[in-house]
Amino acid sequence: TFYFRPQNDVVLEAGNRYTYIVKVNATGLTLEGCTIGDWTDGGGESGAAEDLGYSIQNDGSYMVYNAKGLLAWNKAVQKDESINCTLTADIDLTGKDWTRIGTWPGYSGVFNGQGHRIKGLNFSAATTELFGLLNHRGVIKNLQLIDVNLYGSNGSAAGIVDQNEGQIIACSVTGNISAYGRTCGIADLNYGSITACWFNGTLKDYESGAIVRYNYATITSCYWGGNVGQGAFRNEGGTVDATKVDGATVKWQTAVDGMNTALTAGD
């Protein structure tokens, strides 16, 4: 393994990619754009590249393929709540600390799970959700949260987001959600749209809604199973199209067909 150490600082800017062609000759290493000499054996140092778990695209969006990468995006999005994220593999967050995303004015990017799963989301906090506030430009889609175990110690708990003002599309949550106060499977408050989403699990039965607690906007073709009797605890002038899968009159295949119809309605 060989290393070179330039005499002057080399500045590599975050979010950019740098490609060099390396040629080895008798006098040193030649890189595209610069020549570096006086190189020596690295003395046994490891030359293995660190697996960051993500790559950054030209537009600044993250492509994430493991827990380390998702946590790196989480850290970045705390400073810039418009950064897009796309999952390219299933993610295991078991044993990882999660900071929910979206304070005022809220997350405004696109989080695309591409049908992949996030498992192991297991934590207790004042309020526990993957996202805090999704603003009117924000989108969360094609995401599965499986086997969550959430406890809101000082308020509400929901699977996907505390307050939705954007779009939640084709997302699902399974597991157990409890709280000192209110619980819901997808969102606590809905001021946006929730389409083709489902929840299957156990909620603390206090002001709970399998899809949302308070709905002020639109819920379309959503389904749930589990111990809760209503898709929305309270509807405040919105539209609620949410159906419980009881295994008798409504089965999960019915739910799948209904959600697929909603997702392809505009095609």
Task: For each feature predicted by the language model, list its residue ranges.
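Extracytoplasmic cysteine-anchoring/structural motifs
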Residues: 1-52
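Surface-exposed repetitive/solenoidal architectures
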Residues: 49-267
